[in-house]
């Protein structure tokens, strides 16, 4: 039921959008990553980043989505309200949004105040998406992507993750290469690393 709920959160907005989908096969789990970014007026923007991961050892499917509704208040800056949903927590947030994009570089940053409905605590969160795709020749671009997520209560670290992708992108916006997904949990920053390969497409 939760998987259906996560999917429906991405459906209300129609029209021209930026969509990126990646399939990732790692040594510990397989992941599907989707990024949805839409400017639907001069001021309003909707951003969502979702993953579905399948763990080989536990045979568990773990859905997760981070989404924000943003309102521009200045050049590249805005205010933001959203929610981070996983199988462990539902975490609403309010904060700021920063976005900038050109032919080779795209960056989105969302620092926010958060509330964990599981821990019943307020805290701080940060989501960052960075893509760098400089041109190599007429057929190929170098492709790199970094996603950083961190959640802290005012007492301790809760969870963080880093998604790293390095590879090539062709003229049809198909991407392929190597990568890793790194996660840290708890105050001791217990770390897990999932190395693998990916293939993706931008629409």
Segments predicted by a language model, with ranges:
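Start-of-domain marker
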Residues: 18-66, 70-72
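Residue-level signature of outer-membrane beta-barrel architecture
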Residues: 38, 71, 98-100, 130-134, ...
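Outer-membrane beta-barrel "beta-signal"
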Residues: 191-203
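Ordered, amphipathic secondary-structure segments that act as subunit-interaction surfaces
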Residues: 79-106
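Solvent-exposed loop/turn segments connecting transmembrane beta-strands
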Residues: 23-33, 54-63, 84-93, 114-125, ...
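Repeated loop/turn-to-beta-strand initiation elements of outer-membrane beta-barrel proteins
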Residues: 42-48, 75-79, 103-108, 135-142, ...
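Detector for outer-membrane/organellar transmembrane beta-barrel domains
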Residues: 99, 103-148
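Bacterial Sec-dependent N-terminal signal peptides
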Residues: 1-21, 203
